[in-house]
Amino acid sequence: MNRYLVTLGVGLPVLLAAAPAAPWRDTPVARLEALALIQTLNGEILASPSATLTLERWCRRHALAEPAQLIARQIEANPAEAGAAVRQHLQVSAAEPLRSRRVELRCGEHLLAIADNWYVPSRLTPAMNRLLETTQRPFGKVVQALSPQRQTLAATLLWSPLPEGWERAARGAPAKAAGAGTLSVPAALFAHQAIVFSARHQPIAEVHEVYQRDILAFPEPGLSAPQP
């Protein structure tokens, strides 16, 4: 499986996923559908208090795995230390202990996101800290009893299926023929940076997430799928 690195947020290297399991044909309609799906998930995460639960719903809706259950697979034993900006966002001093996780958020075989997470252990229960240290449960599920809410600091579209200037293309220009090739989808589709707050509006974590192309790892929607 081929992988490569990019940099996100505070300069951390992020491991990106290999090719998706279900490539789409490269047609104008398929590109529009891909953009619509990317922006749908992007908007759902922005509007949701939990990226974890949103990804699980997405996995279930598009039958990516059975059961549609998200796991957080650790990919680095010693994630980077939190910088001054993270501590400022979390409203903690330089002396306050922070812990971090760098994980792959997977649903079945599909890598849906890479997440870097810095959290304040003193603001979680001992049981929550133990689960974060010893299990593959996603952060959002572990802290669910705190009724967490997200405040987005940044949301970035990393790839658009529509080429720049597509709206200025000459009318009547020939479109790519159906079945002319496979849609080439890069590993990273969009990224979020957010603060997670408890119900008391106390910051408990900062997360940097890069959402991966396996969010589209299902057959083309009916509008663009080949007809029998």
Question: Language-model features: where?
Answer:
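Positively charged n-region of N-terminal signal peptides that target proteins for export
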Residues: M1-Y4
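Bacterial N-terminal signal peptides
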Residues: T7-L15
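N-terminal domain-onset segments
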Residues: P20-R106, H110-F190, F197-E206, V210, ...
